[in-house]
């Protein structure tokens, strides 16, 4: 199925001289419609208050609403999924599952889908993204970053809250009888949504009332204040807490609700085929709009019987026309074209119902526009009508039925508009309620750019993921390092997390120093030292931290001594024995001056008689007494600073592998200490492929990806070499255990690999093909969203974060 799914709508249109004059109505139907309008205009009951206008009897705490003497309803809020950018086979699967979902409802269930786009106070969003000042020297940076976020907010329509609801109801003699059946239907609906991969939330009575309050009071920023205890305490009805100041339906073509003005129209389907983009286009409008689909299932047996009767009637008409032709001397095969068309359509419809799992529905589609002024309302209605026209449909105002239209636009499951259109399952399913997901969380959410489809801000908190491990992937110049620095800066400003960077290219130190961090430059000539034998009592989950530390020192010796065949079993035994000896004094009295160094391990090895011990000691000698002795010192830098950068650019070829392994162990030390303090540790590894090329560092990286999550660690690998991530089954675990992936522009080969591994559709691939710096796809759990980040270049932070030589600010 292509990006625009089209299904037959089976219209019955009156045509004359090639022109379409609208849906074909019988004399009886016309009479009924005229009577309806007269009834609405002349005999409408005048209600005495705004509360009396709201058409329900009682709202219960558990979310069941008694709408009238027999109708009881419940509401479920559901989220969006990616449909418009999905793979064609995925779109087909979504469409088919959605069709099966619609077929679930039998004729005893009333169904209403409500899509409410409502502008809210932008100040609420600004509060969420505002970074409050703190008592430190970084408030100028906070102010600048906060201003950047405020500017990005204005580019989208984050001020527009988009909600999707399904309301379902049944008729019953009592609340008790209704509850059991509604609960069963609710469970089935939730399971159907789960099959579609859609997150859902059944609404309580309070939440349903809040939805109604927000619809009725969209002109006011007054918060919803209500509890069911207040009803008993005050003697008021729940309607008193949700009603607007007034309703005014006197104009006939529009209504007033408080200070807001609105109008309800119905969608007249004239198109021979329907398009799955139509609903999405309505909901993409940047104004207050509510779209409602009221759906009634026709009993299958009755539907088939009705169509058979219609076919019989058409056949009778055909016979009459043929008789007339014979009497007039014409060819009896020449009959009116409309008659032939309707006959063929009716037979195809009957075949669909009998053989293709299609059902018949009566559908009412209502669209409500609201605005602060009449001019804005007319503009919104014009835009809505233009979208309808684009898809060969018409938007018809509900003249003198605005009150019924408004009440039918509330998610309470009541349809007071008797304008229905017969549609099959496939035609109804074309109104797919899914477009693209938004990623906007509150709390400690960080900024990752703008949604490329909606221009809305992407704000997420990786800690909310089941597995916060992450990867930032892209070609050189695509913005990998910049994206990592932006995330680090954001985390530094709004969280208490510690941040550690392994920096093989000396790209991060300007930012680290600006944020008061510690840059540790490790090289053969540096005086910054870190001790590979550092340990703390929390180093392992086990009571004895030496087991895990011994494993690290074995990996280190493997790198130094091992060669092609690695360490032999005897050598591993000797090293393990020596490790336990070297830590005896420190563990007995854990003070810094008793922390062992590499030379202590070397001396213990030298004191042992086995030739293997001497071989290991000899291999270690260059790292103890020789020219590579940079790691034979106690740590003399502040590894406990909140922001630490390990600059290993100058380590040289001989020491780089060992240096990366030792840095990883230092990070593990920090993670274990922070875990005891309930603090998260963010660890960034630039040029991540370098760690994956060596067996020891690759194995250690895999362990980090497995262990970090439950210790409060959030590792992030940054690389341009996707192939190295899939070099072996073991390393592939890193890819599979990353719930956060930030994809920037990709080379052709890597793009194909990633598309297969991450199930990226051709439409989504466009966002990582020849894309500009800072553009791509963000994978957050099961959600995929295209993004763009045009970070302002006239900011101080930009100059500290960019890696472009002409723009870099060196300190």
Named regions from a protein language model:
Residues 1-434:
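Extended, folded cores of ATP/NTP-driven motor/assembly subunits in large transport
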Residues 81, 88-107, 114-118, 281-283, ...:
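P-loop NTPase motor domains
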Residues 472:
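Hydrophobic anchor at the beta1->P-loop junction of P-loop NTPases
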Residues 483:
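Hydrophobic positions on the alpha1 helix immediately C-terminal to the Walker A/P-loop
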Residues 758-811:
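Conserved P-loop NTPase
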Residues 490-500:
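Post-Walker A helix-loop "phosphate-sensing" segment adjacent to the P-loop in P-loop NTPases
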Residues 480:
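Conserved lysine of the Walker
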Residues 516-520, 730-743:
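A short helix-turn-beta junction within AAA+ P-loop NTPase domains corresponding to the substrate/partner-engaging
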């Amino acid at each position: 199925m292509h990006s625009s799914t089209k299904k037959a709508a089976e219209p019955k249109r009156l045509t004359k001289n090639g022109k379409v004059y609208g849906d074909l109505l019988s004399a009886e139907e016309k009479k009924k419609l005229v009577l309806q309008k007269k009834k609405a205009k002349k005999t409408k009951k005048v209600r005495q208050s705004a509360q009396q206008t709201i058409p329900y009897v009682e709202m219960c705490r558990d979310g069941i609403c008694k709408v009238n003497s027999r109708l009881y309803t419940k509401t479920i809020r559901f989220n969006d999924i990616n449909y418009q950018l999905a793979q064609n086979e995925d779109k087909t699967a979504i469409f088919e599952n959605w069709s099966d979902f619609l077929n679930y409802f039998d004729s005893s269930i009333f169904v209403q889908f409500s899509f409410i786009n409502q502008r809210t106070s932008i100040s609420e969003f600004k509060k969420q993204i505002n970074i409050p000042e703190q008592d430190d020297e970084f408030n100028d940076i906070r102010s600048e970053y906060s201003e950047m976020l405020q500017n990005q907010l204005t580019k989208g329509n984050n001020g527009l809250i988009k909600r999707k609801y399904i309301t379902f109801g049944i008729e019953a003699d009592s609340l008790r009888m209704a509850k059991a059946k509604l609960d069963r239907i609710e469970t089935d609906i939730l399971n159907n949504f789960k099959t579609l991969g859609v997150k859902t939330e059944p609404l309580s009575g309070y939440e349903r009332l809040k939805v109604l309050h927000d619809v009725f009071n969209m002109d006011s920023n007054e918060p919803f204040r209500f509890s069911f205890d207040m009803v008993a305490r005050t003697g008021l009805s729940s309607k008193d807490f949700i009603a607007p100041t007034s309703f005014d339906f006197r104009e006939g073509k529009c209504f007033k609700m408080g200070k807001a003005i609105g109008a309800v129209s119905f969608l007249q389907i004239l198109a021979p085929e329907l398009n799955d983009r139509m609903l999405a286009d309505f909901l993409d409008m940047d104004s207050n709009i509510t779209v409602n689909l009221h759906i009634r299932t026709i009993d299958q047996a009755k539907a088939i019987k009705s169509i058979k009767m219609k076919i019989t009637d058409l056949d009778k008409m055909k016979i009459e026309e043929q008789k007339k032709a014979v009497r007039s001397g014409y060819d009896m095969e020449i009959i009116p074209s409309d008659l032939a068309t309707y006959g063929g359509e009716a037979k195809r419809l009957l075949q669909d119902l009998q053989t293709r799992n299609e059902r018949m529905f009566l559908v009412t589609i209502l669209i409500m526009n609201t605005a602060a002024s009449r001019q804005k309302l007319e503009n919104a209605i014009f835009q809505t009508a233009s979208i309808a026209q684009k898809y060969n449909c018409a938007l018809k105002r509900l003249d003198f039925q605005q009150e019924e239209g408004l009440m039918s636009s509330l998610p309470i499951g009541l349809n007071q508009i008797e304008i229905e259109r017969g549609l099959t399952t496939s035609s109804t399913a074309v109104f797919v309620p899914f477009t693209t997901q938004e990623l906007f969380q509150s709390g400690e959410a960080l900024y990752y750019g703008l949604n490329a489809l909606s221009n809305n801000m992407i704000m997420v908190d990786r800690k909310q993921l089941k597995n916060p491990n992450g990867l930032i992937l892209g070609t050189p110049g695509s913005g990998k390092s910049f994206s990592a620095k932006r995330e680090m800066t954001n985390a530094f400003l709004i969280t208490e997390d510690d941040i550690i960077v392994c920096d093989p290219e000396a790209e991060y130190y300007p930012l680290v120093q600006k944020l008061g961090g510690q840059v540790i430059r490790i090289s053969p000539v540096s005086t910054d030292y870190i001790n590979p034998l550092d340990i703390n009592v929390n180093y392992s989950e086990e009571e004895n931290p030496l087991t895990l530390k011994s494993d690290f020192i074995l990996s280190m010796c493997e790198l130094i001594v091992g060669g092609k065949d690695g360490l032999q079993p005897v050598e591993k035994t000797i090293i393990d024995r020596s490790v336990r000896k070297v830590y005896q004094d420190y563990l007995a009295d854990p003070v810094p001056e008793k922390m062992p160094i590499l030379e202590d391990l070397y001396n213990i090895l030298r004191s042992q008689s086995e030739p293997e011990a001497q071989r290991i000691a000899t291999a270690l000698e260059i790292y103890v007494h020789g020219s590579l002795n940079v790691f034979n010192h106690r740590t003399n830098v502040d590894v406990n600073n909140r922001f630490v950068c390990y600059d290993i650019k100058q380590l040289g070829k001989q020491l780089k592998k060992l240096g990366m392994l030792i840095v990883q162990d230092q990070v593990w030390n920090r993670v274990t200490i922070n875990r005891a303090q309930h603090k998260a540790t963010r660890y960034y590894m630039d040029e991540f492929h370098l760690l994956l090329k060596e067996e020891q560092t690759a194995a250690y990286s895999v362990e980090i990806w497995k262990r970090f999550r439950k210790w409060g660690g959030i590792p992030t690998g940054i690389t341009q070499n996707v192939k190295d991530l899939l070099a072996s089954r073991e390393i592939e675990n890193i890819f599979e255990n990353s719930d956060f992936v930030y994809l920037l522009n990709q080379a052709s080969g890597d793009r194909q690999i990633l598309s297969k591994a991450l199930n990226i559709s051709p439409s989504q691939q466009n966002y990582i093909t020849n894309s500009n710096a800072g553009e791509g796809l963000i994978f957050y759990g099961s959600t995929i969203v295209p993004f763009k980040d045009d970070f302002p270049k006239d900011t101080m932070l930009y100059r500290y974060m960019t890696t472009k030589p002409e723009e870099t600010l060196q300190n």
